From Swiss-Prot:
<dbReference type="GO" id="GO:0006412">
    <property type="term" value="P:translation"/>
</dbReference>
<dbReference type="GO" id="GO:0005524">
    <property type="term" value="F:ATP binding"/>
</dbReference>
<dbReference type="GO" id="GO:0006450">
    <property type="term" value="P:regulation of translational fidelity"/>
</dbReference>
<keyword id="KW-0436">Ligase</keyword>
<dbReference type="Pfam" id="PF02686">
    <property type="entry name" value="GatC"/>
</dbReference>
<dbReference type="GO" id="GO:0050567">
    <property type="term" value="F:glutaminyl-tRNA synthase (glutamine-hydrolyzing) activity"/>
</dbReference>
<dbReference type="GO" id="GO:0050566">
    <property type="term" value="F:asparaginyl-tRNA synthase (glutamine-hydrolyzing) activity"/>
</dbReference>
<protein>
    <recommendedName>
        <fullName>Aspartyl/glutamyl-tRNA(Asn/Gln) amidotransferase subunit C</fullName>
        <ecNumber>6.3.5.-</ecNumber>
    </recommendedName>
</protein>
<comment type="function">
    <text>Allows the formation of correctly charged Asn-tRNA(Asn) or Gln-tRNA(Gln) through the transamidation of misacylated Asp-tRNA(Asn) or Glu-tRNA(Gln) in organisms which lack either or both of asparaginyl-tRNA or glutaminyl-tRNA synthetases. The reaction takes place in the presence of glutamine and ATP through an activated phospho-Asp-tRNA(Asn) or phospho-Glu-tRNA(Gln).</text>
</comment>
<dbReference type="GO" id="GO:0070681">
    <property type="term" value="P:glutaminyl-tRNAGln biosynthesis via transamidation"/>
</dbReference>
<comment type="similarity">
    <text>Belongs to the GatC family.</text>
</comment>
<keyword id="KW-0067">ATP-binding</keyword>
<keyword id="KW-0547">Nucleotide-binding</keyword>
<dbReference type="InterPro" id="IPR003837">
    <property type="entry name" value="GatC"/>
</dbReference>
<keyword id="KW-0648">Protein biosynthesis</keyword>
<dbReference type="InterPro" id="IPR036113">
    <property type="entry name" value="Asp/Glu-ADT_sf_sub_c"/>
</dbReference>
<comment type="subunit">
    <text>Heterotrimer of A, B and C subunits.</text>
</comment>
Length: 95
């Protein structure tokens, strides 16, 4: 697949991007190079190769679930403008 200058101009128009004629030519060349690379990659036979989530086979180390901060709820609610039954009260903003 290759894009023509008209294709790039149409895509730019649809995307509402102002592109000069010089930029259209350069962009068409760049996109066609990308499409060529994609065609080369698709030509590679990958049958029998298992997909990878990451290029390196690394297992994640899990850490213990430990509380690292003290419970300061009462201190925060002591300085709050309004609190009711342990909940912060805020003004209604949407009717």
């Amino acid at each position: 697949m290759s894009l023509t200058h008209q294709d790039v101009a149409r895509i730019a128009k649809l995307a509402r991007i102002n592109v000069s004629e010089a930029e259209i030519a350069a962009t068409a060349d760049q996109l066609n190079n990308i499409f060529g690379l994609i065609e080369k990659m698709q030509a590679v036979d990958t049958a029998g190769i298992e997909p990878m989530a990451h290029p390196q086979d690394v297992s994640l180390r899990l850490r213990d679930d430990v509380v690292t901060e003290p419970n300061r709820r009462e201190a925060f609610q002591a300085v709050a403008p309004q609190v009711e039954k342990g909940l912060f009260l805020v003004p209604k903003v949407i009717e």
